[in-house]
């Protein structure tokens, strides 16, 4: 439910103010929900998840104001801008995950007949209940199979999803300023500069409340031997209390660890002692972390009749805790690239941002003023240049022991900050680092999520459009015939207009964590990952996909009078 009010105020002939306020409220109905008591009884350090209740409905207020100032009152220089709060809505599939993961609203039942070499070897007699006509009434299906319609015993599933009771829909504070300047020359020439800053007010984040406070973490040595009866007997020896960190330059948090060299296979170190229980319990919540800005400059010109020129450059930065990469809260939480785990993420570069982009276009119109069907020809060439993707340098496996393979890599500044399994690994690693601009320029730092950019791709699109006009009686008919060649440069040269892929470097996962030196010396060791049995020597290679090739599109359009 939303309400909006807006007004304009002209201050003289040169300044116009526009101001307004919006009220939004997303309301919920709890009647169709039922609490799973088995989930609610789980204690996560005093927190409980109520799967039978949506967040509290609340009004969100979004005031805003904008202005346009005609500086010289002749439209040659305009300054415009504004500031305000804007409310959006996240994909509500993240809400519906709460009841669907509550083990209360759905159940899978499989009836099947088994065959072997065309012969029936197993038949579920319940299938006989389906003999006859098609059944579309759910109540008939329930009656035929005597399916339960009430929940007799609540059971907590392995995946639990919740929504914070005070959850708010996403809100951002946006501020912008722009200048439009008509350059005093003999032909139309306009230069526009724009800047917009965005700060998160209520962004969306997901936390796993099943992870204990780090001060409560325990690390154990587990030894398993055969007992007198031949059964395995495991003894536990406490090694550490309180969260541990790796030794050395890469001193990230340790959830669980293994030894670099552990010939005694019946000994395991640091089992899972950082969770309250065996359930993943993720909760949708809010955070104010994150911001973004965009700066743009655009030039438009018409130096001669029927010739239009445009050139624009845009620089964008965006930092966020989570871009919600998925539709399932568990996989979304696990999908974050992190250093210390998905619960300990600061604002990092958005995986969807394109930091720099250049576009340009040339358009020319050739009119035909003689009698005939053809009335004009439009020629257009459009250019776009940008980095085709942002990537993260991560380890190939789970270094910090949180059970998720999303650990951002530490980029050592020299040999003193990293231990390799072999000399060949060391040589191959440094050779790879020196050929990669991101790694080479960020030594001694943790790799930032999605901060490594693929090489720029330059693409041109060409359009030829013909205007046709004729009369039937007194009625004039117009239609257009167009020919579009997308990525026309690739038609000229098969190497042009092709983006780069990082599959040649195992998607930027070049180091494998091999474990720590000992139970008391948590210094990590690494090996260089091999792709198809060979050390990678370059980060990017040609992306071979039909989507990179040139395309021809022919269109026809009728223009109604």
Spell out what each predicted region is.
Residues 24-28, 74, 84-90, 186, ...:
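Structural signature of outer-membrane beta-barrel domains
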Residues 3, 19-25, 81-85, 193-197, ...:
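Transmembrane beta-barrel strands of outer-membrane/channel proteins
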Residues 3-9, 65-69, 177-181, 297-301, ...:
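Residues on the lipid-exposed face of transmembrane beta-strands in outer-membrane beta-barrel proteins
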Residues 145-148, 270, 371, 376-473, ...:
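Extracytoplasmic gating/loop element in the C-terminal half of outer-membrane beta-barrel translocons
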């Amino acid at each position: 439910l939303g309400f909006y009010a807006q007004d304009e105020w002209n201050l003289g002939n040169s300044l116009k103010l526009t101001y307004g306020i919006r009220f939004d409220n997303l309301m919920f109905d709890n009647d169709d929900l039922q609490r799973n008591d088995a989930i609610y009884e789980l204690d996560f350090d005093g927190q409980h998840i109520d799967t039978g209740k949506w967040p509290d409905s609340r009004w969100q207020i979004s005031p805003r104001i904008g202005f346009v100032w005609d500086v010289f009152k002749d439209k040659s220089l305009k300054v415009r801008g504004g500031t305000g709060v804007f409310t959006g809505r996240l994909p509500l599939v993240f809400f519906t995950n709460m009841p669907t993961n509550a083990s209360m609203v759905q159940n899978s039942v499989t009836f099947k007949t088994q065959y072997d070499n065309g012969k029936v070897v197993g038949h579920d007699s319940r299938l006989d209940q389906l003999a006859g006509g098609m059944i579309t009434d759910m109540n008939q299906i329930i009656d035929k199979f005597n399916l339960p319609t009430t929940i007799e015993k609540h059971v907590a599933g392995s995946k639990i999803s919740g929504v914070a009771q005070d959850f708010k829909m996403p809100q951002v504070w946006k501020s912008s300023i722009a200048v439009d300047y008509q350059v005093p020359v003999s032909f139309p020439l306009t230069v526009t500069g724009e800047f917009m800053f965005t700060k998160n007010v209520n962004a969306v984040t997901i936390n796993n409340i099943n992870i204990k406070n780090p001060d409560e973490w325990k690390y154990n040595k587990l030894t398993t031997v055969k007992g007198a009866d031949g059964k395995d007997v495991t003894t536990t020896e406490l090694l550490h209390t309180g969260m541990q960190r790796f030794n050395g330059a890469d001193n990230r948090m340790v959830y669980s660890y293994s030894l670099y060299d552990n010939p005694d296979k019946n000994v395991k170190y640091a089992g899972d002692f950082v969770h309250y229980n065996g359930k993943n319990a993720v909760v949708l919540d809010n955070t104010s972390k994150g911001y973004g800005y965009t700066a743009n400059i655009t030039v438009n010109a018409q130096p001669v009749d029927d010739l239009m020129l445009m050139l624009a450059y845009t620089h964008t930065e965006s930092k966020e805790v989570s871009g919600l990469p998925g539709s399932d809260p568990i996989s979304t939480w696990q999908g974050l690239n992190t250093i210390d785990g998905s619960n300990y993420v600061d604002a990092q570069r958005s995986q969807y941002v394109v930091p720099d982009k250049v576009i340009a276009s040339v358009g020319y119109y050739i009119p035909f003023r003689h009698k005939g069907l053809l009335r004009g020809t439009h020629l257009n060439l459009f250019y776009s240049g940008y980095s085709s993707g942002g990537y993260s340098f991560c380890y190939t496996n789970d270094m910090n022991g949180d059970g998720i393979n999303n650990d951002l890599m530490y980029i050592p500044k020299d040999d003193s900050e990293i231990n390799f399994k072999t000399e060949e690994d060391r040589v191959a690693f440094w050779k790879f680092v020196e050929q990669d601009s991101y790694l080479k320029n960020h030594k001694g730092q943790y790799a930032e999520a999605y901060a490594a950019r693929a090489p720029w791709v330059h693409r041109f699109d060409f359009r030829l459009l013909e205007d046709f006009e004729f009369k039937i009686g007194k009625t004039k008919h117009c239609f257009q015939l167009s020919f579009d060649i997308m990525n026309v440069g690739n038609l000229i040269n098969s190497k042009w207009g092709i983006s780069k892929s990082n599959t040649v470097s195992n998607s930027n996962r070049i180091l494998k964590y091999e474990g720590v030196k000992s139970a008391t010396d948590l210094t990590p060791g690494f090996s260089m990952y091999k792709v198809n049995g060979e050390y990678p020597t370059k980060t990017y290679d040609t992306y071979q996909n039909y989507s990179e090739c040139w395309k021809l599109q022919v269109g026809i359009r009728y223009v109604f009078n």
